Amino acid sequence: MSSEHVEFTKDNIDLYLKEVAKEYRKQVGKGMPAELILIGGASVLVNYGFRNMTTDVDALIHAASGMKDAINRVGDRFGLPNGWLNADFKNTASYTPKLDEVSVYYKTYSNVLTVRTVAAEYLIAMKLHSGRQYKSDLSDVLGILAEHGKRGTPITMEQIQKAVTDLYGGWTSLSDMSQAFISNVMEDGRFEQLYAQIVQG
């Protein structure tokens, strides 16, 4: 089955993570706890309601070697593509070990697998740092800003600047394009309308 035909949603990510935890526990027992930190599209899915799916699950994986087998077995059982849950993100410019420190607790499965996520201004900082002008990266930034506004916990430019500095050492680590994009949308403030324009465009 090719990855084009697999869509990960909040519900099925939960199911697959539960199965991975069970499989991992079967292999290594209770004494070897593991941790996954969801990033990218998967982190958007579990923290926010504006996005329906992603095509793979990116994570930082802290676990015994049995985790790889557990992931592959669950993938085989559900007909998921190789690499459906992967740590390839570690090879990108957006990776920094500081993501561990800023991640927030999400859920524990089978008393052995703790799942954390990167959210709010830190997820925005990662999206901006990747510098990709992909529709989904730009719409994710706007969706996160819009949803925090609706929740009554708006994210400020100062918080975003601090997050970029915490993770990547300074504002100038962002491309000129990313700096201009976030400055313009924060000045504009109509996050929902801008989100709709990008998604429809």
Regions picked out by a protein language model, each given a short descriptive name:
Residues M1-G201:
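Compositionally biased terminal segments of proteins
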